[in-house]
Amino acid sequence: MENGAEASDCDSDETVIEGSVTENEPEDEELPWRRLLLNQDTTCRSEFCFHSGVDGMQKGIHSPEIQLGLKLRKDSQEQNNKNKLLLALSEDLVLQDPQDKTAQNQVLLQTTKEFPVFTVSFPHPEVSWSHQNTGGHEAENCENLPHSKKELRENSDSPEVSLLSGTSPVAPDLVALKERLTEPVKTLAVPNTLSEPGEEVTQTMTSKETKDEESSLETFVSTLEKLLESSECTQEERLLEVMDDFNPQELFSTLSNSLGSVSVPLNAWAAQGRDELENKADAALPAKLLAAVNTGADVGPSCQGQEKSSSVSGGNGCLAVQPIMSQVDEDCTQIAQNIEDPKPFRLQTLTHENAISYEQINKKKNSDPIKNTSTQETPRVLRRSSRLEKLKASRDVVHTEAVLKKPERILSNTLSFKDQINSIFTTDSFSKRKNMHSSGFKNEQIRKSEQLRKKNGTGEMKKMCLCTINRRNVFGENLLYKAALHNDVDLVRCCIKNGENVNQPSYDGWTALHEASIGGYYQAVSELLKGGADVNVKGKYQITPLHDAVMNRHYKVAELLLMSGADPLFRSDHGTCALDEAKDSSMETLLMKYIPQQKKCHLSAQRNSTDPAHVEDMFQNKKPKLSSNNYTEFICDENFDRQEPGHLEINKGSNNLLMSKEYVCEHCQKDSNTTKFGKSNLNSVKNSRTNVSKRKGQKNRQQKKTQVDDRDCNLSQKIGTSSFRRTNKLLTQQQHAVQTLSDLPEESFELSTTTLSSLENGIGYNEACLVSKKSDTHVLDSSDGQELESVDQTEAASVSELSSYKEIKLLPVTTHQQPHTNQEQYSSPYKSLGNNSSNEKGKATNKWEDSFFSFIKGRSADSDSDCHTLDKSIASPKEGMSHDHHEEIMTGQEVDSQQRLSSENYFSQENDLKVHPLTTHPQEEAVNFCDSNLISVQHTPDYKNCLHEISFGNSYAKTEQSSTSCTRPPSTQKVSPLTVEVELLKGLQDSLAHRDSSPLVNQAGIHSLERKQDTDKNYTKKGPNTSSSSRPLPTVVHSQVIEITKAEKRREDLPGNEPINNTDFYSTDINKELANSSQLNQRKEKENVRKSDAELTHNDSEAERTLKSCEEKKKNMDSETHSPCDIQEHRKDQNFRKRKCSLKAPCSQGVNTTGIGKRNKKGESQLHVAARGGNLSRVKVLIEARADVNLRDNAGWTPLHKAASGGFDDVIIELLQAGANVNCENIDGIVPLHGASAGNHLKAAEILLEHGANPNQKDQKQRTALDEADDEKMKELLKSYGAIESTNGEKRNSTDLVKIPTVQPKRYKQFICDNDKAIGSPVPSHKAKKSESLPVHQTISAILQDIEEKQENLLKLEIRNSEDEEQYIGKMLEIKEVMDNILAQQKTERDDLAKKYRVSMESFKHGALREQLANLATRQKSLLVVAKKQKKIRLKIQNYKNATAVSGVGLRKLPCNSDISSDKKSQEPPTMGDSAHAQPGLLAPVSLAYGSMQEIPLSPEIESESQKINICLNAEAIRREEFSGNDINSKQNVQDCTLGGLLRSKPTDDAEKIASSSQPAALTPHAENSQAEATVKGCGFDSSALTGTINISEDKSIFSPNGACLAADPHSQKLSRCNPKRRNKKTASQQPSAGAAEPLPQAPAVLDTYTVHQTLPCLRDSAAAASHTDSTQSSLSSASAHQHPTKTVPHRNTTPRKKAVQLKDLILRGRINPGNNILEFKTQETTHRASVLPSGKLKGENGQIYQNPVTWLKELLGGGSYVTWNYAWNTVTYLGRELVKCVSEEAPMSAELNPPQLHQPHLSAGTSRESMQTIPHYLQIKEILQISKQELLPCHVMEQHWKFYVGRSHSEALLSW
């Protein structure tokens, strides 16, 4: 026995449950009841162990029960004393004779019915069961003992007493105790764990009731109850306290390890039925049980005396109540929840134990309560992943089989967890039991349970140690994993907070995120993702959580994963991504939102190439579905034969499809009675998509099948129409198409039966199943040795069921529109049932029909390997239709075999054709079904199709020839897509209106329309049918093809594809087709190019006529015609392909080039007509034939006008590429952009704008394209390209009135500026036409060259008389007007560049802006040369006037100048006549930089006025903040003032104004860092050019003649009012008023040649300064004289007061930049930071906006604090630097804006230095060194150096270097 005990301990591989104690534990940890029974003095603890039963197991076999030990807290002395009080009672209970014990047990049982609280264990640590005695010798039944020699001695050590429930199983090592209500006999079950297997110790004790025993038992129970109630915490609390240290291995611990601990569930005593013992005398087992033991049969628990039972189980029979334990994991980690039941501790069993009970109960068919539980869901007591249930079940099967083989095994009656809960809470007996408890105990339990919930819900979880969280069970699942599995969000959050690894996978590879995703637990998934879970974690088979969420249709979880970065295109080992797993359009749409746009094209092509269901999903919400209960009426014979179910098994390498389907075959007799076929049950057979790699594991999708019901309803038969098609992971779309037939003549029908027509890979029948009475099983094997590449391929098969035919008379069709010269033959290697032939080869499809062909995208289109053919019966209103398509896969062998076929006949179909004497054809039409985006089902009444019928061969027991034909795909040959589309007659359109959801409309396919050419012939069967034919016989389909699309555009990576060059399909997205081409197809495409042009092209004129006629027919089509694709879109795609084809073979189009220039009565050429109609192919051909793209019709319209007005984008692009003028005008001044804008053709307008169209060009009505636009999108598009609103345009025009003569010559036209803005400059018409097609830069350069030529001619002209003088002046003014407009354009372009520079400084270092800046500088240089010559011209006429001494000639001869500036006349004072004239003797030499200037007079009034204007504008420039509309307007006002004075002075001032206006344009490139750019480009500015500009502006007033009228005082006052506050800043010398101006010695305007070359300012510091200089220099054009006395005002520093400077000023001047937290204000306590906004305002840390730093500091320091500007700007720092320093650095620049006194030349006597303007100091930079960013110091280091050098003088800084 001792050896046995040792063996038992060694065999156990499980740890002990908390609360149970091993033999080697310390003395204080031993079980207290064991010590209590043995009268030991050690400190006792009460242990209460409860379980469903004691099931003794074999050695090494885990116990199938969960033992949950409950350890009471050590209540030292109080608990020990209470246990001692029970000692005597316990000894009496155990040591008395068996009879007394039996009586006591009975009394105890009856007494404790009202107190079913706990199970009491009496374990003995030292004494094994073999040494324990439970009764006398008379209670022993030796017959049932395996070892009869073992005797239980009375005075041996006391064994543990176990009072078990009636449901306790009698195991090999267990003696079951059973009771009966009428005769309460107790069986004491004592496990003998150390005995050999199969041994059983059974003892029966006859009960003899005695009052003493009863009283002793009552005393025991009451004492025990008091003990329990007096404890400080409930048993549940004590159980939860030890859960953290619980070992998961103890869940499987055997009884041997528990040392005989046996449970006594008091609450279950009265709940059990009593088993009647057959032999009361010897207390033996009942006969039934003995028989079961001896024979090894399985005997269920006996449930007798249920009616008499007063147990709480009520009508539930034999009930074993399990405890309601809340969330106990496999490792016994407790997830605390409240146990509301007053009887919380019940029995609990494992799942597999219940499963065994169910199995045995079902075998024995026991009582109804047990039967009910067999159908219940197995309780998931132990938390397992749903993926691992099979693994657990397989482990349990081995264990179960070993247990069931034992004859001694009697399975217990166990109920499911759900049933037990229901039995407790729903039965009436539960209420009785509830009342039996004392209210105090119940309230105590509830109260403490709530406390436990709060305690464990917060504190316990937070205190969980990491070892507990990371503990993993046998499946590798940790606590977080199981919490996610059960959607315990709190526990998930707690585990993550305690440091759990959220990406820890189980042994099977699954993570907690996988489990939460597959369950759809949104909160759990969210917590896991917040905790750092990898959203793309790969589980088993590379499956991501997104796969699980999508497959289970958890939309919110899927969206959460996608938002967290889940990849919807990641493919698992099965080759499927999450998008493929989508089961409905909603999920698919959700996934598509998170797919990058660049991948959608490729993805769509892939999906559509293999998934016809995807196409159907796109239209399922657009078309109503037919009900599956539609019925078909059919006329046939009453006697019909039914084919028995046939089984089709398709064996593929990685996927098998087994179809069991009943094919109903009706045999119709000629003399048949009417038979109505009832409602059809339409079932779909679902098959999973074939994958390249074999699928493994639990994620494998099972192929599903559905049998079509075949029923008889009186004389009716239900016809099952099934639709087989490919699905993406259970994505199944059922298509139903049933049409009601009636009133069909009997003789027009012959029975056709269901025929499986398969494609490419040999999945097909060699013979049709017609009226077969036996079931045939066809095993069709596809090639096993080859696997397709990369992506899944689909299977396609078509079955036409029960289709009737009716001969319908075809209407005659004209054949003049069907040329027979150019035809294409489409042949398909279908297996022929007979001799196939084509009776007509001259039929072609018209172009309009071709435009509605759907192109097969991707690999399925031209690969000839992945096709889905739907042989569909399209019936008239009197015709039945059914369809059934299967899926098949193409193999490389089939591709190779197909390559041996004729490449010309790449489309073929197997139709047995016959020629009937009548013009009839069967009404059943075969429609090809292939993957595509769209469906084209067009009904053209006048163009009938030669329809391909479905050939049903081998009419059973009937004629060999039949009007029905069977389309037979080959089983070994490759099949190209069958391109046949139904062209219905006009009379049948109404009947098809209600069939919107029919497969014809609902399934996208490639449809080839055929036209009936001969009315005397049609397609019928020809020759007898053959039962099995494997040779491919092509059926030629003729179709007129306008262009050929290369196969490489539509095929993908299928090896061995035969190139197809005559494809007649059109895709809705040519880009996707191009993207999906493969190298293999490109290599094979080269072979197709060699084909003759005769096969590829057709007569273009005939095609055009056909297209036009079809378009007219299309407009008249019935509204019910279904065309999901847009007509115009198809036409565009078609035109695109035409153009591609025309590029390859333009001469083969057959266009007559001799009549290209021929015009119609409107003056339109062929190109005009083609462009107007949007005929891209014809436009392309005409362009290739060198048609004039700029040819104008009678109204001045060009082909581009026509195309733009019609919105034909492709034609517009073609014309522009051919050289069409984008800005060509008609006689009304309308350009193509006007037409596109008026027609709201957004795409056309965008194309025109991209090619240089001017959005501001006006017609004769002064309307721009923006004025013509009505659509907001069109307006936004035009504005984005620089279009200006009409109000702005009016302002601009009113300003230009000053510059342009009042009567503008008609020969002048506008020209286009560089920034797409019209300036309205008058250019000679011949020059305008010449420069229209040239770039803007070249256009202006050409204009300047033309001006130079005119200037040379003027200089050569001799002025002899007044007529020559007038002619001279007129030409000079003409040149001046052109130059003025060019200057205005230059200035506008300069301003735009300045704005762009402020936005992005880096953009000027490269790209278009850099080139634009260089072009602007080049044009400016040319303009300066022209201005210099213009000055010479003015000097010439001035010298002539001076020489003739006729001073007033100039004014009398030029009245137009006053007319031009008539708006300024009102400002002229009455003293205008008192003008001073300069004397010729006052001329002094003026030294100019160029050395070419002559001596000219200098009026002091003019000089004074010029100085005043300059000072005023400089002062105003300081306050300028940005380039805004107000700024531009103010500059225009200044310019108007200067122009007024200039034009009133004399005509010779024109060149001065030009020169002065050119100054700003010359300075602008400097502001934009043009020097650096020019240096890089190698074309730097010429210093002389800039110097000349300044010299001209300096000396603009020199050229005033003696008789020139000087400006009056009000004009100068207006200029001085620019900024009244700064009048005192003027530096001009003012002289007293006098009748005539005093002569002033001339001052030589000597400027250093290098001065301007040295004026390259820093970009950031001079961007705004350049604009101010622009205004300053432009003001020099004023020649007005000031007549009031003037005083010389000494030079003053014009630095603005610091208070006037704001942050916005500093931002505009580049001193500071907007940013976040860049301003700081430090106090003793903290540092406050603020952000600077672009508007100059501040944003504090609290988000509040402040106007300036002063208000910010007031808020920080308190509302009552007074903050001055000086304090704020001295304490607030910008990046560590005080703001006041930024202002102080700005002061020198501001001062330099005023005329400095540096570099003044030597002046004559009487001339003050302040009166001369010089180059500002900041423009004297000699060179700029550009360095790379790598050479720059870090910001903080550079800031330190900068502060150091700023604080030192210039000399000290130089010394420091």
Swiss-Prot record:
<feature type="region of interest" description="Disordered">
    <location>
        <begin position="813"/>
        <end position="844"/>
    </location>
</feature>
<keyword id="KW-0040">ANK repeat</keyword>
<feature type="repeat" description="ANK 2">
    <location>
        <begin position="508"/>
        <end position="537"/>
    </location>
</feature>
<feature type="region of interest" description="Disordered">
    <location>
        <begin position="995"/>
        <end position="1038"/>
    </location>
</feature>
<dbReference type="GO" id="GO:0010780">
    <property type="term" value="P:meiotic DNA double-strand break formation involved in reciprocal meiotic recombination"/>
</dbReference>
<dbReference type="GO" id="GO:1903343">
    <property type="term" value="P:positive regulation of meiotic DNA double-strand break formation"/>
</dbReference>
<dbReference type="InterPro" id="IPR042334">
    <property type="entry name" value="ANKRD31"/>
</dbReference>
<feature type="region of interest" description="Disordered">
    <location>
        <begin position="1046"/>
        <end position="1065"/>
    </location>
</feature>
<keyword id="KW-0158">Chromosome</keyword>
<feature type="domain" description="RAMA">
    <location>
        <begin position="1687"/>
        <end position="1782"/>
    </location>
</feature>
<feature type="compositionally biased region" description="Polar residues">
    <location>
        <begin position="1555"/>
        <end position="1570"/>
    </location>
</feature>
<feature type="region of interest" description="Disordered">
    <location>
        <begin position="676"/>
        <end position="711"/>
    </location>
</feature>
<dbReference type="GO" id="GO:0005634">
    <property type="term" value="C:nucleus"/>
</dbReference>
<feature type="region of interest" description="Disordered">
    <location>
        <begin position="1540"/>
        <end position="1570"/>
    </location>
</feature>
<feature type="region of interest" description="Disordered">
    <location>
        <begin position="1609"/>
        <end position="1640"/>
    </location>
</feature>
<feature type="region of interest" description="Disordered">
    <location>
        <begin position="195"/>
        <end position="215"/>
    </location>
</feature>
<feature type="repeat" description="ANK 4">
    <location>
        <begin position="1162"/>
        <end position="1191"/>
    </location>
</feature>
<feature type="region of interest" description="Disordered">
    <location>
        <begin position="1663"/>
        <end position="1697"/>
    </location>
</feature>
<keyword id="KW-0233">DNA recombination</keyword>
<dbReference type="Pfam" id="PF18755">
    <property type="entry name" value="RAMA"/>
</dbReference>
<dbReference type="Pfam" id="PF12796">
    <property type="entry name" value="Ank_2"/>
</dbReference>
<dbReference type="GO" id="GO:0000785">
    <property type="term" value="C:chromatin"/>
</dbReference>
<feature type="compositionally biased region" description="Polar residues">
    <location>
        <begin position="1023"/>
        <end position="1032"/>
    </location>
</feature>
<comment type="subunit">
    <text>Interacts with REC114; the interaction is direct. Interacts with IHO1.</text>
</comment>
<feature type="repeat" description="ANK 6">
    <location>
        <begin position="1228"/>
        <end position="1257"/>
    </location>
</feature>
<feature type="repeat" description="ANK 3">
    <location>
        <begin position="541"/>
        <end position="570"/>
    </location>
</feature>
<feature type="compositionally biased region" description="Basic and acidic residues">
    <location>
        <begin position="1082"/>
        <end position="1136"/>
    </location>
</feature>
<feature type="compositionally biased region" description="Basic and acidic residues">
    <location>
        <begin position="1008"/>
        <end position="1019"/>
    </location>
</feature>
<feature type="compositionally biased region" description="Polar residues">
    <location>
        <begin position="814"/>
        <end position="839"/>
    </location>
</feature>
<keyword id="KW-0469">Meiosis</keyword>
<dbReference type="InterPro" id="IPR002110">
    <property type="entry name" value="Ankyrin_rpt"/>
</dbReference>
<feature type="region of interest" description="Disordered">
    <location>
        <begin position="1457"/>
        <end position="1479"/>
    </location>
</feature>
<feature type="compositionally biased region" description="Basic residues">
    <location>
        <begin position="692"/>
        <end position="704"/>
    </location>
</feature>
<feature type="compositionally biased region" description="Low complexity">
    <location>
        <begin position="1663"/>
        <end position="1683"/>
    </location>
</feature>
<keyword id="KW-0677">Repeat</keyword>
<feature type="compositionally biased region" description="Polar residues">
    <location>
        <begin position="195"/>
        <end position="207"/>
    </location>
</feature>
<feature type="region of interest" description="Disordered">
    <location>
        <begin position="1"/>
        <end position="30"/>
    </location>
</feature>
<keyword id="KW-0539">Nucleus</keyword>
<feature type="compositionally biased region" description="Polar residues">
    <location>
        <begin position="676"/>
        <end position="691"/>
    </location>
</feature>
<dbReference type="GO" id="GO:0007129">
    <property type="term" value="P:homologous chromosome pairing at meiosis"/>
</dbReference>
<feature type="region of interest" description="Disordered">
    <location>
        <begin position="1075"/>
        <end position="1137"/>
    </location>
</feature>
<dbReference type="InterPro" id="IPR040843">
    <property type="entry name" value="RAMA"/>
</dbReference>
